[in-house]
């Protein structure tokens, strides 16, 4: 490897927890420190698979639940070559949702186990840091544009949060919980501090494989 690799940093949380805003602020902060950084979002709605997912989320089409889950996973896998190349080039990737969202949302539906939901994503690039933005779903429901898409109901989001809490028991993943009920700047400071530490640590380590 010709240069120190970038870190893979993921922000997770229930809908409207502020992930997208914080991803943007973190990328700017990393760039201002003199390092390369880019944002990635899942689902990536620009691909053909992503467009199928987008139509489903916007309630323009209906898809069978197993099919939807596998489409979300395929959407992540199709971006793996790009992710690996960028990390090897020393670009830090800040990711707005990843496999953990896929597992939490599908396993919140009746009849889906965590294990079944995790299997399609086994072997994805393993994040160096996963920050969960903790926010009460009732508070999230009062934030802008809530309820416009499928899954944006408080009852479902509470179940999703429970599934995230189960996923966070996995000590092989570097989870950090952030209180997202505070101001944007307070949340950003915590995220920035945690990310700066992990970027330095990740430089000398190979990219791992998720859930292996």
UniProtKB/Swiss-Prot annotation:
ATP binds at residues 16-21, 97, 182, 192. InterPro entries: P-loop_NTPase, Thymidylate_kin-like_dom, Thymidylate_kin_CS, Thymidylate_kinase. It is an enzyme of class 2 (transferase). The keyword Amino-acid biosynthesis does not apply. Keywords: ATP-binding, Kinase, Nucleotide biosynthesis, Nucleotide-binding, Transferase. GO terms for molecular function: ATP binding; dTMP kinase activity; nucleoside diphosphate kinase activity. Disruption phenotype: The number of knockout embryos is obtained at the expected rate. Knockout embryos show microcephaly, neuronal cell death and early lethality. At 2 days post fertilization (dpf), forebrains in knockout animals exhibit higher amounts of apoptotic cells than control embryos. The head size is significantly smaller compared to sibling embryos of the same batch. From 3 dpf onwards, mutant embryos show markedly smaller eyes and prominent pericardiac edema. At 3 dpf, mutant embryos show twitching movements, reminiscent of epileptic seizures. GO terms for cellular component: cytoplasm; mitochondrion; nucleus. Its cofactor is Mg(2+). One of its GO terms (biological process) is dUDP biosynthetic process. Pathway: Pyrimidine metabolism; dTTP biosynthesis. Its EC number is 2.7.4.9. It catalyses: dTMP + ATP = dTDP + ADP. It comes from the Eukaryota. Belongs to the thymidylate kinase family. Catalyzes the phosphorylation of thymidine monophosphate (dTMP) to thymidine diphosphate (dTDP), the immediate precursor for the DNA building block dTTP, with ATP as the preferred phosphoryl donor in the presence of Mg(2+). This is Thymidylate kinase. It comes from Danio rerio (Zebrafish).
